[in-house]
Amino acid sequence: MKSNIQLHYCYFLLSEAKKKASYIGYSVNPCRRLRQHNGEIKKGAKKTKSGVPWNLGICVGGFPDRVAALRFEWAWQHPNICKVTRDNIESWKIVKTKKTSENKRILNKRQWSIQQRVSILLCMTTLEPWKNMNLTVFVFKDELENTIKEVIEGIKKIKISPNFTSPNILNKDYLLMFLYFGEDSFYEKGIKFLRCDYETFKEFQKPSFDCDSDSNIEDNSNVFNPEEIISHEDSFSIKCFLCQKDIGIGRNYLEFPCCTEIKVHLSCIQLWGESNNHLETVIDELFPLKEFVAPLIPLNISCPCCFKDFEWEEAKKNYIKTKNVPTESLELGEDFPVLSNGEKENYSQEENSQNKVIEDGFLEMDIDNHRNRLSYAHETKQKRDILFSDDEFSEISQKCEFIDLTVDSD
């Protein structure tokens, strides 16, 4: 049965072909995404082509929404650029620094090792806003579990004591309560590290809303074949970076000058921008949902990739584009009827009338989408997302064990 509730994960892959290679990504279904990276099904990333086969090493779940997961993913990928992490990874001695003649610190830019990636993850889980999200870190490899413990032992020497939750699960009821809510009267809030087998994780993972199972996805073993023929329709498709839906012909979209490959719907960037803070306020129940009205026009927006800020008026004037019918489609040799002047005028009036109806329809769709997202945010707060059923928890409690990462204070 399809579920309308999406779970958001950041995953960490390890390559069998290249022992030092790793990859960080985001998905609502990491197991299906792993198959895509390995070329079993369509739409794998180009960067993972040379490292096939890949294995799932770490998976971080429990994010409140897609935006939070994407921001976590970007910070994990670019810790030397992210404002939240760049100073802290220095204090954790994860990376060395240099000083120029102008006394500016420059982080060494090189490929991050697997141990550094794990250290960065542990560092991020102690920082705002992630330390308050009650995230769960699923660890699938013994070597990664050992690496995590080594990092914990290492940071003791520099007098850093992160607060990792390592509960003592007494029985199934405590396990249910802890994984459902992340807290109860016995345990404090914190990041949970769970040692889990990949097959167990795959078995208990619910299918995402867009497919019942992996069997619904067309098999394409040659997905990484460079000679693969791309269809004419797909070659001109533009997808919104935030909602991952196609931008229709005639629709306006925003293209950021800092990241030209990032294109988003205007309605999506409106929710990402000024109203994002208001959504967090609604979720935190600082005031009821019925009293909340998000601004239809944001004052400021930020690039979803690098988080560079832009004023809405500036973006509206300079960066909004319209997706038009590609000129190549007019060169396919299609025969078009020759119209007289009177027929052209009637056709033009008819087309303008249709465009007006389409624009009104898009406006109503944007308003409905906005209202539905707000209702979903409120509904998610009122009713916690249940990852597994009682029967599934009974089995997972026997197959998984929590990793003890308790740091004794000196």
From Swiss-Prot:
The keyword Nuclease applies. GO terms for cellular component: Slx1-Slx4 complex. Its main location: nucleus. One of its GO terms (biological process) is DNA repair. InterPro entries: GIY-YIG_endonuc (IPR000305), GIY-YIG_endonuc_sf (IPR035901), Slx1 (IPR027520), SLX1_endonuclease (IPR050381). Gene3D superfamilies: GIY-YIG endonuclease. It is found in: Nucleus. Belongs to the SLX1 family. Catalytic subunit of a heterodimeric structure-specific endonuclease that resolves DNA secondary structures generated during DNA repair and recombination. Has endonuclease activity towards branched DNA substrates, introducing single-strand cuts in duplex DNA close to junctions with ss-DNA. HAMAP family: Endonuc_su_Slx1. This is Structure-specific endonuclease subunit SLX1 homolog. It comes from Cryptosporidium parvum (strain Iowa II). The lineage of its organism: Eukaryota, Sar, Alveolata, Apicomplexa, Conoidasida.
